[in-house]
């Protein structure tokens, strides 16, 4: 694993070779397109490192990529492998200038010029080129998994975030998330600047952000904790049978409210160590700024991603409500 990481950090992945049954093309730095020489019935994007310090998904995807290189991992899907923010990965930082996962869908045009605004545009163009290639002989279904780890602890260690999406996701997609070991699935109800919202909104992909655990430095991740996710991804890209789920049933949530910080006087009334999915008491004032307060409603008590340190205009937390297993959007 250490050699794989070194190859990524020192621009040596381009020297990796693949079996003659796979056509490999680099669409940009850290953007690898793999097309089976035979026809394919699905196009899949696997992305990691959109936040540069989230190393476990990077190590896991490198293992999958090594299996493809050695011919040990079958590939029947058209596949785009994305290492999202390479300068931040090499620096061991979440980002250098802007949060890359807030800049997709053209939002990079309004951001301060820098590493992440350039990279968001480059990734958008690469995705467009990939789907154009995969549809050359007829349109095929599209899937995107963007793999992350979280800054704070969580009552649900592994969970999926689904972007706002007209209609519901397919039964096969929910089966993929369940087989991947997700403890919870959260459905967004508003558009956002994430990579997965971009691929879902612009290209109709079945997309999800997977949060796999805690942020750790390279070499300190226990990849056994992510074995279910790796097995499910391996089955996905090979059109194989999904591995059986060995956990308790998935819990489902829907975002009811976003807490948006609009000024520097914003305060978040939470313990800095509070875990994601903690249930807060009804009536509790969770956040305040000059013109607005946020109070917990009884039907949406669960907090996700609380962070008072975000820039003005960014999300400082989400309030969730428990949902039925079907997460269809309301009419």
Locate the predicted segments by residue.
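Structured catalytic-domain cores with a bias toward divalent-metal coordination
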Residues: 1-331
């Amino acid at each position: 694993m250490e050699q794989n990481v070194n190859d990524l950090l020192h621009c040596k992945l381009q020297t990796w070779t693949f079996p003659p049954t796979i056509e490999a093309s680099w669409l940009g730095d850290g953007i690898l397109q793999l097309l089976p020489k035979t026809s394919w019935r699905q196009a899949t994007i696997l992305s990691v490192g959109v936040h540069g310090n989230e190393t476990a998904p990077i190590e896991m995807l490198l293992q999958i990529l090594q299996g493809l290189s050695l011919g040990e991992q079958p590939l029947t899907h058209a596949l785009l492998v994305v290492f999202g923010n390479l300068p931040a990965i090499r620096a061991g930082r979440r980002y250098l200038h802007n949060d890359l996962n807030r800049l997709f869908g053209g939002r990079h045009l309004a951001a301060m010029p820098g590493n992440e605004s350039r990279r968001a545009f480059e990734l958008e163009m690469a995705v467009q080129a990939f789907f154009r290639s995969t549809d050359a002989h007829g349109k095929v279904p599209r899937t995107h998994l963007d793999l992350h780890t979280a800054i704070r602890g969580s009552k649900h260690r592994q969970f999926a975030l689904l972007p706002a999406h007209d209609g519901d996701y397919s039964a096969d997609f929910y089966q993929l998330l369940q087989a991947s070991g997700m403890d919870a699935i959260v459905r967004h109800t508003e558009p956002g600047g994430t990579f997965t919202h971009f691929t879902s909104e612009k290209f109709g992909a079945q997309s999800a952000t997977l949060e796999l655990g805690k942020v750790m430095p390279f070499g300190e991740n226990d990849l056994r904790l992510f074995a279910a996710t790796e097995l499910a991804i391996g089955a996905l890209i090979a059109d194989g049978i999904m591995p059986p789920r060995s956990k308790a049933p998935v819990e489902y949530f829907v975002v009811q409210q976003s807490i948006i910080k609009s000024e520097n006087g914003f305060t978040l009334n939470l313990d800095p160590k509070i875990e994601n999915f903690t249930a807060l008491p009804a009536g509790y004032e969770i956040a305040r700024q000059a013109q607005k307060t946020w109070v917990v409603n009884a039907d949406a008590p669960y907090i996700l991603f609380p962070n008072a340190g975000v820039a003005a205009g960014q999300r400082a937390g989400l309030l969730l409500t428990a949902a039925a297993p079907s997460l269809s959007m309301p009419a």
